[in-house]
């Protein structure tokens, strides 16, 4: 008997239209490459479609199972809240659900950081060797210790390739962005390349990170600094989603 399957990607949520565009693009490629009968996304908070609506959309397509991808870079509080809420709703609706692992702890994320840096160097015609570049990776930050551990795992993976690799957080953890810039200045900086470790072009990447960063750069009089693009709707993330899905689905009898 042929079983119909859906993939539902749960994101934190954002008011920025670019976030919906990126998630829509990812869902489209996931459906094609993963062989799903239906793919969609929903949000934990901020704006609809919320999780309940996302599940109902899948159910309306008469699928037999829903594979749920908690689309988070860290195993923090928001991820746990998403899984708990989705599990409860699926139980109430009597629909079979399979949860994947989040995106964290995978070499693809390290490759994406390197790719964003190389893209920037190419775009800006930067000829400096990687051995002369100081990298500052900016994460969101979380009160969950597991989130920090996962973030540091990814950042540490690119340490061998650059003059120095440093990290800081937008909020909820230390060092903050100003402290991150100060730490680099204190060690003697080469060419500074800043990587915003965010999935989407949301309010944080468009405004918050840049405001904090530019303020710190001005304070410490750093004139030669460049900021890369965020992670975005990259096919590498699609491949990671599908790998996580296969891992989870293969464990179900």
Predicted segments with their positions:
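Active-site-proximal alpha-helix that buttresses catalytic centers in soluble enzyme cores
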Residues: 1-253
